[in-house]
Amino acid sequence: VKVGKTSYYVDTKGHAYVGFFKLGNRLYRGDVKGRLTKNKTVSNVTFNSKGYADNDVNAKLKIELMNVISRITNPGMSKSQKLYACWCYLTSSSNFYYSGYWPDFNKKGWQREVAYNMLVSGGGDCYGFACTFAAMAREIGYNPYVVLGRVSGTRDGAADGLTSHGWVIIDGCYYDPEAQF
């Protein structure tokens, strides 16, 4: 629906969509008044002059997260219950498997790319698990932090007995979903 120069998408009851929403394979966003977001970037997702998101890894990740989280949670769950549902989903060997993938840490947005790749392929290493859990946590309202460090291990073959590893911190708590595999 267009009112003057402002575009809206409305449901069958005439209510404008607010927040991120999907129509077909496209991602849109309505502001608090339901006005379609255009020529703007919100939460790393860039919207064009027609009001739908560019088809880049940020929009694809957002869509994947919306799909998965809507399947594994419900609106009656608390934020912490949703986080636990995300944890259970990600650490279930029936949903994901361990596979080696070394991201380009110098590439801007590598965390989102790694999370997207893991969600669509089903496989990842510690960085994939950490980035995916962080992306899921962010989607439900947390402010996660992906940590890159070194822990005891021999995977890297380093003489000091340490190996590179990635994990997540959320509200001061440490989460290591890859450690479940």
Please give the residue ranges for each predicted region.
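Secondary-structure boundary elements
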Residues: 58-118
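A glycine-rich, coil/turn loop motif that links secondary-structure elements
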Residues: 104-108, 119, 123, 154-159
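Extracellular adhesion/carbohydrate-binding repeat motifs centered on closely spaced tryptophans
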Residues: 1-63, 150, 155-171
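Active-site nucleophilic cysteine motif
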Residues: 82-86, 90, 122-137
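Conserved aromatic
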Residues: 10, 30, 73-76, 120
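Hydrophobic/aromatic-rich core segments of domains that either
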Residues: 128-181
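Generic, ordered loop/turn and secondary-structure boundary motif
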Residues: 2, 37, 97, 119-120
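Aromatic side chains
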Residues: 8-9, 28, 87-89, 96-98, ...
